[in-house]
Amino acid sequence: MINRKLIRIKTVQVIYSYCLNEGRVFSDSQAAGKGEFKEVCRPELVENNLLRSLGTAYDLYNTMLTLMVEISRLALRSYEAQLNRSKRLGLPAPSRKLIDNRFMLQLEGNRQLQENRQNQRIDWSNEEEFVRSIYNKVMDSDLYREYMDTNVSTYEEDREFWRKVYRHIIIDNDSIDSMLEDFNLYWNDDRFIIDTFVLKTINRFKEDSTDEHPLLPEFRNEEELEFARKLVRQSVMGAEYYRSLIAESTRN
């Protein structure tokens, strides 16, 4: 998933921070909220910062996928409440179309996504009020009404519905940007690239996809990981030159 464009962006961020701090980087203990800066004596210290930053980008990818899952779970709870009310009042049962959406059932049951959730910074199940605000936007949207009004239900329609929800409701949402920024200052910088990966992931699901359907890996192959390591190490070796450029620019 992490391509060379994202690697270059993250490398610039890490090296810029390195230069501003006069060659100091965060230690692992400080990243956890304790400890102090350590003077850089080995390029691998900066390399660790880069790999950690890339890891948070992959965390964002999984976080955005699980946001859709949590919206669907809230839809199920709403359906169950409506069903109980309908039974009490002797009314027809509400439509199951949304909660039986075949693509979403695949995504929710995906084993890789379930495993990745263990390491996520945001547990959407603890953010029900926020998730409900997104759910309400979905319920009030034209795309939801159009989806529910169709007479024929196909897998392609189910998948396309969630692709549209992501593209038109989740991507263009300032409240999501604010929420993500509270958890990681750099996540909004990553959103554009990560959003394209989420849409690509949705499109890769097929009607016969099982719970073993692969999501995008953090790195496509070992070559991409080695590229990241080599790029940041070479950048560290030229850090004095880059600091001089920053100093010259700030004087102007």
Give, region by region, the residue ranges found by the protein language model.
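Class I Rossmann-like S-adenosyl-L-methionine
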Residues: 1-252
